[in-house]
Protein backbone atom coordinates (compact mmCIF):
# COMPACT_ATOMS: atom_id res chain seq x y z
CA UNK A 1 0.00 0.00 0.00
CA UNK A 2 2.75 2.47 0.91
CA UNK A 3 4.66 1.59 -2.23
CA UNK A 4 1.68 2.51 -4.39
CA UNK A 5 1.26 5.77 -2.45
CA UNK A 6 4.93 6.57 -2.97
CA UNK A 7 4.71 5.88 -6.68
CA UNK A 8 1.61 8.04 -7.12
CA UNK A 9 2.22 10.86 -4.66
CA UNK A 10 5.98 11.54 -4.83
CA UNK A 11 6.04 12.75 -8.46
CA UNK A 12 3.14 15.09 -7.72
CA UNK A 13 4.85 16.47 -4.60
CA UNK A 14 8.07 16.92 -6.52
CA UNK A 15 6.25 18.87 -9.21
CA UNK A 16 4.60 21.08 -6.58
CA UNK A 17 7.99 21.77 -5.01
CA UNK A 18 9.42 22.79 -8.39
CA UNK A 19 6.45 25.07 -9.09
CA UNK A 20 6.76 26.63 -5.64
CA UNK A 21 10.47 27.29 -6.18
CA UNK A 22 9.82 28.85 -9.58
CA UNK A 23 7.08 31.09 -8.14
CA UNK A 24 9.35 32.29 -5.34
CA UNK A 25 12.15 32.99 -7.82
CA UNK A 26 9.81 34.98 -10.03
CA UNK A 27 8.25 36.96 -7.18
CA UNK A 28 11.56 37.74 -5.49
CA UNK A 29 13.90 38.47 -8.39
CA UNK A 30 16.63 40.45 -6.62
CA UNK A 31 18.07 41.85 -9.85
CA UNK A 32 14.67 43.25 -10.82
CA UNK A 33 14.27 44.83 -7.38
CA UNK A 34 17.73 46.40 -7.63
CA UNK A 35 16.79 47.80 -11.04
CA UNK A 36 13.63 49.31 -9.53
CA UNK A 37 15.75 50.93 -6.79
CA UNK A 38 18.01 52.45 -9.45
CA UNK A 39 15.01 53.64 -11.45
CA UNK A 40 13.49 55.23 -8.36
CA UNK A 41 16.77 57.04 -7.66
CA UNK A 42 17.00 58.25 -11.27
CA UNK A 43 13.42 59.54 -11.31
CA UNK A 44 14.10 61.45 -8.11
CA UNK A 45 17.36 62.91 -9.45
CA UNK A 46 15.77 64.20 -12.66
CA UNK A 47 12.89 65.70 -10.70
CA UNK A 48 10.06 63.43 -11.83
CA UNK A 49 9.48 62.08 -8.33
CA UNK A 50 9.04 64.10 -5.15
CA UNK A 51 11.29 63.43 -2.18
CA UNK A 52 8.36 62.03 -0.19
CA UNK A 53 7.41 59.61 -2.97
CA UNK A 54 11.08 58.71 -3.44
CA UNK A 55 11.58 57.92 0.25
CA UNK A 56 8.38 55.87 0.48
CA UNK A 57 9.22 53.85 -2.63
CA UNK A 58 12.81 53.40 -1.49
CA UNK A 59 11.66 51.95 1.85
CA UNK A 60 9.23 49.60 0.09
CA UNK A 61 11.89 48.38 -2.33
CA UNK A 62 14.52 47.92 0.38
CA UNK A 63 12.06 45.87 2.44
CA UNK A 64 11.25 43.77 -0.65
CA UNK A 65 14.96 43.26 -1.34
CA UNK A 66 15.60 42.20 2.25
CA UNK A 67 12.73 39.71 2.05
CA UNK A 68 14.02 38.36 -1.27
CA UNK A 69 17.51 37.89 0.18
CA UNK A 70 16.08 36.04 3.17
CA UNK A 71 14.00 33.78 0.94
CA UNK A 72 16.97 33.06 -1.33
CA UNK A 73 19.10 32.15 1.70
CA UNK A 74 16.41 29.72 2.85
CA UNK A 75 16.09 28.22 -0.63
CA UNK A 76 19.82 27.40 -0.95
CA UNK A 77 20.31 23.74 -1.66
CA UNK A 78 16.79 23.22 -2.92
CA UNK A 79 15.83 22.41 -6.47
CA UNK A 80 17.44 24.75 -8.97
CA UNK A 81 15.32 25.52 -11.99
CA UNK A 82 17.30 26.52 -15.06
CA UNK A 83 15.59 28.69 -17.62
From Swiss-Prot:
Main subcellular location of this protein, as a coarse class: other
Subcellular location: Gas vesicle
Keywords: Gas vesicle
Signal peptide location: none
Keyword Signal part of the UniProt annotation: no
Pfam families (alphabetical): GvpG
One Gene Ontology term, aspect cellular component: gas vesicle
Induction: Transcribed from early-log phase, decreases as cells enter stationary phase, probably as a long gvpF-gvpM RNA. Highly expressed in 25% salt, poorly expressed in 15% salt, no gas vesicles are formed at 15% salt.
InterPro entries xref list: Gas_vesic_GvpG_halobact, GvpG
Record note on quaternary structure: GvpF to GvpM interact with each other in vitro, and may form multi-subunit complex(es).
UniProt miscellaneous comment: Encoded in a 14-gene locus called mc-vac.
Known role: Proteins GvpF to GvpM might be involved in nucleating gas vesicle formation. A minor component of the gas vesicle. Gas vesicles are hollow, gas filled proteinaceous nanostructures found in some microorganisms. They allow positioning of halobacteria at the optimal depth for growth in the poorly aerated, shallow brine pools of their habitat.
Similarity comment text for this entry: Belongs to the gas vesicle GvpG family.
Protein's recorded name: Gas vesicle protein G
Species this chain originates from: Haloferax mediterranei (strain ATCC 33500 / DSM 1411 / JCM 8866 / NBRC 14739 / NCIMB 2177 / R-4)
Amino acid sequence: MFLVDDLLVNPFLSLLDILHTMALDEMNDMEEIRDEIKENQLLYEIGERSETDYQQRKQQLEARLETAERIQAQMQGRIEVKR
